[in-house]
Amino acid sequence: METLTAISRWLAKQHVVTWCVQQEGELWCANAFYLFDAQKVAFYILTEEKTRHAQMSGPQAAIAGTVNGQPKTVALIRGVQFKGEIRRLEGEESDLARKAYNRRFPVARMLSAPVWEIRLDEIKFTDNTLGFGKKMIWLRNSGTEQA
C-alpha cells in the first residue's frame, strides 16, 4: 500500500488530467480538472456529451492518460501514466460525485456538464525527486505494487 499511498498523495495535489480515447482506429485526447478519490482510485471530471472525446467514449470506454506537473528541471519531474476506463455516472452516484467535485472546484456549480468517472486500473508514477528515473507501479486487479 505504500506505493498507492505515495501516488494518491501526489495526485491529490494536482488538478488536471489528460486522457486519450480510441474508436474505430481514431485517437483523441482531452484535458479536464479532476477530483481524485483515493479510496476508489478514480478521477471525477465534468465534460459535455457533445465533445469529441465524450462522443467517442460513449457510456464507457477504455482509455489511457497522464497527470504531470511542469517542473523546470529534470530532477523535479513527477508524473503519472495510467490506463483505465471512463464512464458517465448517473443518478445518486453522479449526485455524490458532483457534490464532492463542486467542493473542490466551486466554479463548477455553474456548469451542467455530466459527471464522468475515470477508474484507474494501472498506474506508473515517475518521481525523480527520489532519484533519477524512480518508478512506482500499481495494478488494481493483482494487488501488485512495485517500487
Curated annotation (Swiss-Prot):
Q: InterPro entries annotated for this entry? A: Split_barrel_FMN-bd, UPF0306
Family designation: Belongs to the UPF0306 family.
The protein's matches in NCBIfam families, at most eight in alphabetical order, are given as:
PRK03467.1 (NF002900)
Q: What is this protein called?
A: UPF0306 protein YhbP
Record gene name:
yhbP
